[in-house]
Every structure is written in structure tokens, then in C-alpha cells.
Amino acid sequence: MSIVQLDHVSVTFKRKKAADVQAVQDVTLHIEKGDIYGIVGFSGAGKSTLVRTINLLQKPTAGDVVVGGVDFVKDGKQVISGKDLQARRRKIGMIFQQFNLLNETTVIENIAFALKHSDLSDDELEEKCHKLLKLVDLEDKANAYPAQLSGGQQQRVAIARALANDPEILLSDEATSALDPQTTIQILDLLKKLNRELGLTIVLITHEMAAVKKIANKVAVMENGRVVENGNLRDVFLAPKAELTQKFVGGSLAVVDTLKSLNISLAENEALYQLVYSLNNVAKSIIIELYREVGVEASMLYGNVEVLADEPVGTLLVMVKGDADKQKATLKFLSDEGVTVTELDERGNRL
């Protein structure tokens, strides 16, 4: 079941002395409960504007927004009351590139600030804050001030604060962009842990495909306010259709570059296939087994292994020699082995 439904959402910024800016254009995304949904694109693509329509920090000018089964926006008009929206927002945590901590208060006081409207007693409040600090591995920093913390530690405090009201959804807007690579990995690992242990749905806004590749299970690629491609991470990453997605991913371009450098000309009995398969499920050599079982010669032209959300996935580009019956048998064998096959022409285009 979708916990977030964005249907035909658009955001247009009106300007008096210049043309209107269409920041988001006719975007439809359905995010399931428990997803880590990556939204990736270059600066100015509309990612941050789009994610803010989920909690109505940015009101759409068109389309529908439904969160947790509750209508927020219908046909570009807010239909949820201000009071109800305030209550629902407490179930949607959000973290940013800037940590937005209160510098004059301690770590534990920063977290407690998010609970100032709760009904918790002082003892219950302190207990909850310490529990949140433990969750983000900062138990020993309760009485420290933000200036005494590293960037990664400050982001952990921001995450703990965002979790204070037990949200169902966490919106992460470029939360790792200001961090070094090692700290970025640590924060992404923490988000993955929260998703796993709390069942937290996470919407991950980033311009870094590596971040999406590491923890997301689904991805949408944005350009000029539009979603140009979206789907399961494995499908989008390993068989990108849009040109922008290919630029982000790189793997598809590597196949094209390989074919360009080899300058292949296929004979009538030859075919090019891109093979994609999980190394967890297919441990044996596909090329050797193909020869043994089908009796065709397969030449490997390109090979690569990517780790997608902790799953090692292999990509091979092979040229198979054989008549029509052999090619048909090849496709059946590979399909039976759990291999995703895409036939390509000499330039790397899908057939």
C-alpha cells in the first residue's frame, strides 16, 4: 500500500516581471510503506521542491497529494485543515544538508525541543531523548554542544530530533551533501538501519547516484522538473532508458563505449546480449554453462559487478554465435537461470 501518493503534481512559481518558473511538472510517484525511495537529479531539477510537497512545506499548484491515506491536496487545492496538517506533519520527519541545530543548547536539549508540545512528563521526556541518542550512537554526547561535534555527529543529532515524534516517514533532503565520503557512508548506513529496525519509510533526495545505489530499493530520476525515469533500483540502474539516467549510472555508457571501441559488425548468425544477474543467485559461470547446455559459443566483450542495496549484481556483454534455434535456446536457458537479457545492436541500442 502506498504511504505517499503524488499524482500529477506541479509547482509553478509566479513572478511579476519575468516568466513563471515551473519547478515541478506533472510528477506522479507512489511510495510504498518501508521503501527507501531515492530521488536523484542535478541541481535545479526540482527534487527539493517536490519532496516539500509531501509535508506541504511547498504547496502544489496542481495535482493530488495523499499521505498515510489522508488527502492533503486535491486538484492543487489544500483539503486538509491547518490543525490536522500540523498533527500529520509530526509523523513526517525531515533532515537537511544544513543541520539546523540550536547552537546555544545541548544535544539532548535540541532533541527535546522537538517534543515541546508532547504530553510526556519530564522523566519520560529525558528517557525518550536518551533512547533516541542511543539509536543514533551518540549516547555519550547528551550534554555536548553542537560546536563540539563533527559534521557527521551533528547530522546524527538532527536525525534523532527528526525521529522524536515517532514519524512514519523521513524526508532526507541532501542530508549527506556537506559530509566527507566516509561520514556519508556512516550516515547512509544509519538510515538503512532505521529503515530496517523501525520500518521507517525514507525519501532520499540527492544528486549522488552512489548514495541511492547504496541504500535505496526504488529510484526516480528528475530533470527540469519532470521524472524522466523511475522504478526498482535494480531495473533502473542496470537497464537505464533515459539519457540522463545513463549519465548518472555510467554502466550503460560503458557498454556503448565498449562496442564503439570494438567496432563490431554482426554476422547473420550472431547476436549481442546484455546479461544482468544477481551473484547471490547465480554463482556459476554463465558463459561456460551456456556452452555446456546449449552448445553455442559466447564471447564476453564487457563485464562489471555493482553492489546495489547490498546485493552484488553482475553485468555481461556477450556475443553469441548460433542459428535462430540456438539463439532461442540461449534466451530460454538464460531466463531459466534467472538472468535478465536485453538484445542490443552493434551500437548498444535495444532491439
Curated annotation (Swiss-Prot):
GO molecular function list:
ABC-type D-methionine transporter activity; ATP binding; ATP hydrolysis activity
Domain ABC transporter span(s) in chain numbering: 4-249
Tell me the keywords, alphabetical order.
Answer: Amino-acid transport, ATP-binding, Cell membrane, Membrane, Nucleotide-binding, Translocase, Transport
SUPFAM superfamilies in the record: ACT-like, P-loop containing nucleoside triphosphate hydrolases
Please classify the protein's predominant subcellular localization into one broad category: membrane
Q: Which positions in this protein are listed as binding ATP?
A: G41, F42, S43, G44, A45, G46, K47, S48
CC terms in the record's Gene Ontology section? plasma membrane
What reaction(s) does this enzyme catalyze?
Answer: L-methionine(out) + ATP + H2O = L-methionine(in) + ADP + phosphate + H(+); D-methionine(out) + ATP + H2O = D-methionine(in) + ADP + phosphate + H(+)
- Topology in the lipid bilayer: Peripheral membrane protein
Q: One of this protein's Pfam families, by short name?
A: ABC_tran
Q: Which InterPro entries does the UniProt entry name for this protein?
A: AAA+_ATPase (IPR003593), ABC_transporter-like_ATP-bd (IPR003439), ABC_transporter-like_CS (IPR017871), ACT-like_dom_sf (IPR045865), MetN_ABC_transporter-like (IPR050086), NIL_domain (IPR018449), P-loop_NTPase (IPR027417)
Q: What EC number(s) has UniProt assigned to this enzyme? A: 7.4.2.11
- Where in or outside the cell is it found? Cell membrane
Q: How does it assemble?
A: The complex is composed of two ATP-binding proteins (MetN), two transmembrane proteins (MetI) and a solute-binding protein (MetQ).
The task this protein performs is described as:
Part of the ABC transporter complex MetNIQ involved in methionine import. Responsible for energy coupling to the transport system.
Q: Which family does it belong to?
A: Belongs to the ABC transporter superfamily. Methionine importer (TC 3.A.1.24) family.
Q: Extract the PANTHER family matched here.
A: AMINO ACID IMPORT ATP-BINDING PROTEIN, METHIONINE IMPORT ATP-BINDING PROTEIN METN
Name of this protein: Methionine import ATP-binding protein MetN
Supply the source organism for this entry: Lactobacillus delbrueckii subsp. bulgaricus (strain ATCC 11842 / DSM 20081 / BCRC 10696 / JCM 1002 / NBRC 13953 / NCIMB 11778 / NCTC 12712 / WDCM 00102 / Lb 14)
